[in-house]
From Swiss-Prot:
Gene that this sequence comes from: rps10
Organism from which the protein derives: Methanothermobacter thermautotrophicus (strain ATCC 29096 / DSM 1053 / JCM 10044 / NBRC 100330 / Delta H) (Methanobacterium thermoautotrophicum)
Alphabetical UniProt keywords: Ribonucleoprotein, Ribosomal protein
GO biological process: translation
UniProt record similarity statement: Belongs to the universal ribosomal protein uS10 family.
Superkingdom of the organism of origin: Archaea
Pfam families with a match to the protein in the record: Ribosomal_S10
Oligomeric and partner information: Part of the 30S ribosomal subunit.
Protein name according to UniProt: Small ribosomal subunit protein uS10
Length: 102
């Protein structure tokens, strides 16, 4: 049977957990095998900026940071299950990549 590998990325881990819970419920309702969610390494994006706009005075810096969290979910690619996965309500800052394998 075909397998679907679903990769979730987002900046809010609670919203990622919400989408993972929805995928778990779909797997339980349709009776397909599911593996995951597997947490992948978190990517940190750090941008240092100077506080003073004119360049005079002491050099004080601010560091802005954004963390990108990732989860990997494997699910059997049953037709009913995949139709329900496509209908999942996804928050704005969560992106989904679905890869089908045989």
């Amino acid at each position: 049977m075909h397998k679907a590998r679903i990769k979730l990325t987002g900046t809010d881990p609670e919203k990622l957990a919400y989408v993972c819970d929805q995928l778990k419920k779909i797997a339980e309702r349709t009776g397909v095998d599911m593996s995951g969610p597997i947490p992948l390494p978190t990517k940190r994006l750090v941008v240092p900026t100077r506080k003073s706009p004119d360049g005079e005075g002491t050099a004080t810096w601010e560091k802005w940071e954004m963390r990108i969290h990732k989860r990997l979910v494997g699910i059997e690619a049953d037709e009913r299950a995949m139709r329900q996965v496509m209908k999942v309500n996804v928050p704005d800052n969560v992106s989904i990549e679905i890869e089908l394998k045989s």
